[in-house]
Amino acid sequence: MTTSVLRGRLVLEDTVVEDGIIEFDGATITRVCSVSDYEGEAPEASDATYLPGLVDVHCHGGGGESFPNAETAEAALVAVLEHRRHGTTSLVASCVTASAEVLRARAKTLAELAKADELAGIHFEGPFVSHERCGAQDPTYIVDPDADLTRTLIEDCQGYALSMTLAPEKPNAYGPGSVAEALIDGGAVPSWGHTDSNSVKAREALAYSRERFAQVETKRGPRATITHLFNG
């Protein structure tokens, strides 16, 4: 491998190094330190600033292409590369509320890119959301929570389904045999959004998620997430 070195201002997890070094072996970062701690030959000082890549967990597209409408992996890859050019290094592709047939097709297409390490995973925004708080989601395709459809979508994602936005107040969203159960058992995380829920339902949903996460082995964290703090 070829060693290369960058010099500039480094924004790290817990500090900023005003004059630092990033050393690479090929495409792998092998060292990050201040210039004063670097034993090798440092490049000329520069006014460049280097930051960690953005981890984007909710993205619908870019570069003239959208994940919800991408019928081929090649079309979806246009959006992936557009964000990568601008500093996003891990990207989760988000679908929107659509028919079951469309969602299944998109899941299979996006799973191809995830298998090729172009995407970090897949997020479904809907279709089990609130008509009252649908925002930009097409109300035509909003349906009641369906655990069987959820399991089918997870299977279509081939292990790359990360989360699904749903409204916790809807019937069969949470509890035994629910969408939340299917998500957690399938390695994905329930996420709230486009919801008209009250605090009682929300607390019940949180309690159920904690209980279910404790019962299964999963790569995900044991907490539900929130897609939107405002529903639209």
What label would you give each PLM region?
Residues 125-150:
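Flexible glycine-/small-residue-enriched beta->alpha junction loops
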Residues 1-38:
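N-terminal metal-binding scaffold of metallo-dependent hydrolase/deaminase domains
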Residues 60-62, 66, 77-106, 118-131, ...:
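Divalent metal-dependent hydrolysis catalytic cores, especially in the metallo-beta-lactamase
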Residues 8, 22, 27, 47, ...:
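Divalent metal-coordination and catalytic microenvironments
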Residues 38-48, 104-117, 203-220:
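Short amphipathic alpha-helices and their capping/turn segments at secondary-structure boundaries
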Residues 115, 143-232:
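Histidine/acidic residue-rich metal-binding segments in metalloenzymes
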Residues 61-74, 136-144, 168:
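Active-site mouth loops of central-metabolism enzymes
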